[in-house]
């Protein structure tokens, strides 16, 4: 297996279908990548809805995993434990990717290199209007000036999370996300594997699309509500 795509999901809404549809439309051969969709902290009706969608698309390369334990870090760890790919890419369930996302990242893949792509952010319902996004700004800085200027906090921002990258599994090995952190677990994980980085390769194409306002706010509200419910019943 060449690539494992790991998607954590909690009480997904319609945006998950967009995410899965974008992976269904990949130009990269479907038998060369697997999708590990980890439904965490919930089960029905979401599990049945996902199974119905996958059946309709005949997406045989998707492995749906359900766990009652809530948490994006736990979900990603489950995906890593099950991953068979030589390379890993993480995608949030409210983001989607261009048809050539996997193909173009893999074309530049090397065992000692992380391939990175250009993120495009917009508000829900207005994809034609690109919004300012700190990750995009960090990418532009890295792509245009990294070879001329010293490393700075602007560069580090791009590595604050695992998405928008194709990471060699040999970088990760047995390292996992720390489930004890409520915030900053992405940063810690990237720091843990940073000792393996030798080269970075930037693809200056819009391959990763993220909705930075409406969907992320809704996801945060869902997670806060879930935590409150847990606190009430414990």
What name fits each language-model region?
Residues 2-4, 22, 34, 188:
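Cell-envelope/extracellular polymer assembly enzymes that use nucleotide-activated donors
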Residues 3-19, 26, 38-40:
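A conserved hydrophobic helix/loop-capping motif in glycosyltransferases and polysaccharide synthases
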Residues 20-66:
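Acidic donor-binding segment of Leloir-type glycosyltransferases
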Residues 46, 72, 76, 101:
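Conserved donor sugar-nucleotide recognition element shared by glycan-biosynthetic enzymes
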Residues 67-83:
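Glycine-rich, basic loop-to-helix element that forms the pyrophosphate-binding segment
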Residues 68, 91-93:
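Catalytic metal- and UDP-sugar-binding loop of GT-A-like glycosyltransferases, i.e.
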Residues 88:
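Short aromatic/hydrophobic "clamp" motif used to bind/position activated sugar donors
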Residues 93-107, 112-184, 188-200, 210-224:
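Donor-binding/catalytic cores of nucleotide-activated saccharide
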